[in-house]
Structure formats: C-alpha cells, structure tokens
Amino acid sequence: MVHSSMGAPEIRMSKPLEAEKQGLDSPSEHTDTERNGPDTNHQNPQNKTSPFSVSPTGPSTKIKAEDPSGDSAPAAPLPPQPAQPHLPQAQLMLTGSQLAGDIQQLLQLQQLVLVPGHHLQPPAQFLLPQAQQSQPGLLPTPNLFQLPQQTQGALLTSQPRAGLPTQAVTRPTLPDPHLSHPQPPKCLEPPSHPEEPSDLEELEQFARTFKQRRIKLGFTQGDVGLAMGKLYGNDFSQTTISRFEALNLSFKNMCKLKPLLEKWLNDAETMSVDSSLPSPNQLSSPSLGFDGLPGRRRKKRTSIETNVRFALEKSFLANQKPTSEEILLIAEQLHMEKEVIRVWFCNRRQKEKRINPCSAAPMLPSPGKPASYSPHMVTPQGGAGTLPLSQASSSLSTTVTTLSSAVGTLHPSRTAGGGGGGGGAAPPLNSIPSVTPPPPATTNSTNPSPQGSHSAIGLSGLNPSTGPGLWWNPAPYQP
C-alpha cells in the first residue's frame, strides 16, 4: 500500500516533467538552428527589427503581440525551417535592405532622442517586456541591437536600459537650457555680493574723507546740500548729507550720492587751491561765491584734547578772568592759539554762570560785613570768633594811631553829645583810647575787643557826630 501510494505521485510528477521537456525541446531545436548557420542569425534580426519597422514588417509585429503565450513561441520559428535551402541568396538581399532601413530608423530614433529627450522611453519600455514575454531566446538580441546604437550615439545606450532613471536624468537636463537664459542676471548677482563688502568699505572710507575735507574747507552740511542743488540740480537737505556721513542711508542711495559728492568735493578743492588763501574761512568765501550762495562763513571748529582741557580747568579754578598776558602764557604752554584760549575762558565763565547763578565771587566780602558791623553776630561766637576779631583790632589799631589827632578833637563833641543824651556815656568814651592802643593786652578778654573794634570802625567809617550815640546805647553788654 505504501509503494502504490508513493508510485502515484511519481507518475503525476513525471507528466509535467515530460511536458516541460517537450516545451524545452522546441526552443533547443530553435537555438540549434540559430547556431548552425549564419542564415538563421539573419532571421532573428528580422523578427527583432520588425517591431521597429513601420511598413512591411507590421504584420509580423502584430503576430508577436497577439501571441503572448508560451505556446506560440515554438510555432513562430517553424515556417522558416522548410525555407532553409533558399536562405543564402534571398535573405542576404533582405538583410542588406533591412540594414539600410535599420540605419535610417536609428537616425530617426537618434533625432527623437536628441530633440525631445524622452519620447523614446515609452516604446522602449513596451518593446522590452514584449520581447521577454514572447521568446526568451530574443533577450540577447536587444544587446546586439544596442551595439550600433553605442557606436552611433552614446545617448541611446543609457536611456533604453534604464527607463525610470532616465526620466530623472533627462528632467534635470531640461531645466538646464531654461537656467541658461536667466543665468545672466544670476551671474551678475553673485559677483555683486562679493563686490558689496568692497563697495561698503569704499563708501565708509569716502564718507570719512568727505567729512574731514568738508570741515577743512569750512562748509556745513547744509551748504553742501544747497550747493549741490544749485550746481547739479539735485537739492539735498542737511539731514541727507549727515546721514551719508554717518552711513545711515541705504546702499543704493549711498551709491547714488557718492559720485555727486565726489564731483562737488573736487570742484570745491580746485576752487580753494586756485584761490590760494591760507585760512579756511577765506577758502570758504570764494567757493561759496562759486556755488552761488550768500557770503555766509563759518569758522573752523577746534577740538580741544582732554589733557589740554584739564589744564585749562585748573587755570580757570585759579583765575577765572586772566589778563591777556596770562592768556598768552597759557597758550604758549599748551601750544594753542591765544584766541582759542580766550574764547574758551569766555565760554567757561558763561557756563559757570549757568551752573551757579549766585557765583562765589560776590559772596566773599559778605561774611566780613555782618561780623564787622553787627555786634550781635560777633559776641556769641566765643573762642572761635576771637581770632578774626584780634586780626581786625590789630589792623584797625594803626588807623587809630594815625587818627589820634582826630580822636582828640572828637572827645569834646562826644562829651557834649553824651551830656545831652545821658551822663553815663562819658566815662566809656574816656576809656576808649586806653583800650585800643594795646591790642595784645586786650585780646585775652572777649568784651573789650569788640568795643575797641567798634570804636575804630566808628572813627573810620561812620560820621563822628552820629556814630558814638548809636554804638554806645547798648550799655548792658558791659560787665
């Protein structure tokens, strides 16, 4: 039972094997016929080139396309087998004509490939699977057919072998001619980008030199704008010139302004050189007349360095209003012009007045006046106030000695005034000369020193007739 069951599948398996052998015998015979003689080799190009031919070989292509099954493969090569003895003469003529037609078709195909670039791909994609489905023996023939393609055109070899990749290759090639047309603006732009830094550097350098030369020539930014408007017809404001010097304009506007400013600067410099005047103020006058502007002049602005400014501040603190000789000495020490130093001191005094409206200069004599004239402010000072009072008494003692004759003449009047006003005022008047002559002896006591000072002041500054009566009314201050 086991043997019978095993024998049945062997029989069944042998049947398809025999069928396959029968199917393989026919292509083997066909391949043998292809190998036997060169005549059969010419038949295969006929079958192969027939899909590409249009006029006479169209029926053969239809037959191959209508027989996609494998059974028609052995039936197709059967008709040329009985005609083998007549092949050496008839097929040679056919092959010559077919080769000429193939060459023409190849040239047409090359034109199609070269001009559009991708029209050959769909027929190549359809013909290759048809050759694979119809006969496996025709698979090497496309390689034989591609040999003349390789010799005649290198583009045909790469495109039919790879259908989809060729689309990826040919599509980027299509934008290449399109890119070639907009390339001139793109070629102009990339060099502009590397040139921009150099242009910016040139603009920065020109802006610096323009500002320096403009200041040397004595022009303001408004003068430049008006002069350019009258000379070249383009009115520019002062802010435009200042923004150009500060590099605050756009790149295009800077490039537009640069040639105009260069031209104006050259004209102004030529006029200043032709005028041959030493000072920049005088240089500006002919150029202003050349520009057609009114005779407005501007002095050159001087910049003072920090160390020079510190030295001037020190000298200002020492003396706020120096004389012309002192100004000349300061100018020589600092290597500056005398006029510049004089103007600086004037400006510094004005600045001091703005900062301190009540300056310290008039306040200096004011503290001495109340101390000398009012006894109420002098007496409560204590020991600290004795020093200035002693100095005042010592300085005023000289006036008392020089005016001793005047004091002798004033005693009767004071006694008379004292008798009229009150009898108690006469004894202090007699004691005044005894107190004032020895100032060092009376400096130890606080009370006599103010009296001596007041007596001296009364003798020197006040009216003798009215002074004693006013100053000696406060009697309670005496011990």
UniProtKB/Swiss-Prot annotation:
Residues 297-356 bind DNA. It is found in: Cytoplasm; Nucleus. Signal peptide: none annotated. Transcription factor that specifically binds to the octamer motif (5'-ATTTGCAT-3'). Regulates IL6 expression in B cells with POU2AF1. Regulates transcription in a number of tissues in addition to activating immunoglobulin gene expression. Modulates transcription transactivation by NR3C1, AR and PGR. Residues 416-425 have a biased composition (Gly residues). Pfam families: Homeodomain (PF00046), Pou (PF00157). Belongs to the POU transcription factor family. Class-2 subfamily. Its main location: cytoplasm. Keywords: Activator, Cytoplasm, DNA-binding, Homeobox, Nucleus, Transcription, Transcription regulation. The keyword Transcription applies. Residues 389-410 are annotated as: Leucine-zipper. This is POU domain, class 2, transcription factor 2. Isoform 3 is B-cell specific. Isoform 5 is expressed in B-cells and the immunoglobulin-expressing T-cell line MOLT-4, but not in the T-cell line BW5147. Residues 38-60 have a biased composition (Polar residues). GO terms for cellular component: chromatin; cytoplasm; intracellular membrane-bounded organelle; nucleoplasm; nucleus. The gene is POU2F2. The keyword Transferase does not apply. Residues 12-37 have a biased composition (Basic and acidic residues). Residues 275-288 have a biased composition (Low complexity).
